[in-house]
Amino acid sequence: MKSKVSKFYEVKIQYQEMQEDGKEKRVTEQYVVEALSFTEAETRIIEEMTPYISGEFDVVSEKIAPFNEIFLSNNYSDDKWFVSKVAFITIDEKTEKEKKQTFRYLVQAATSELALDYTKEMLSHGMSVYCIDAVQDTPTLDVFLHEV
């Protein structure tokens, strides 16, 4: 497992896909793109998807992703994307009350159970007290990162 901290965008594209019965169907797919701006995210998704889609496609939605860190797996069978919602717990020194600050992480895994295990593994290196509130499947099909 490795971690990538950056700015990410969720980008949805639409295109006509030929079905097995010969009919065309309008398909919407979601991807995550590492980019510095909406313009760069749109340019990157067009560059990445053009070789795989015959015909035209449209970028129909772009939004800043609700996470800024991705946990990437080295395992080839981990082909799905999950969002782990994690609450970090601290004590407010003035009021002496417990405070929770929630963060979301995009996790590459084969199952939600494995995504939970990966999240625990990646967070185990820190000293913070945390609670994993949820691990949810996402419609994200792939993630496009900057090449180093």
Task: Please report, for each region that a protein language model flagged, where it lies by residue.
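Short aromatic-glycine-(Arg/Gly/Cys) micro-motifs in beta-strand/loop hairpins
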Residues: 2-26, 76-100
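Short, structured motif recognition centered on aromatic/hydrophobic residues
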Residues: 6-13, 29-32, 41, 45, ...
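A cross-family "folded-core" feature that marks the main globular domain of proteins
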Residues: 8, 14, 23, 44, ...
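A cross-kingdom feature marking solvent-exposed beta-strand/loop segments within repeated
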Residues: 17-34, 51-54, 97-105, 125-132
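A short, charged, amphipathic alpha-helix used as a generic interaction element across diverse proteins
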Residues: 37-53, 111-126
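Short, mixed-charge low-complexity intrinsically disordered segments
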Residues: 50-91, 125-148
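Mixed-charge, glycine-accented linear interaction segment located at domain edges/termini
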Residues: 96, 104-144
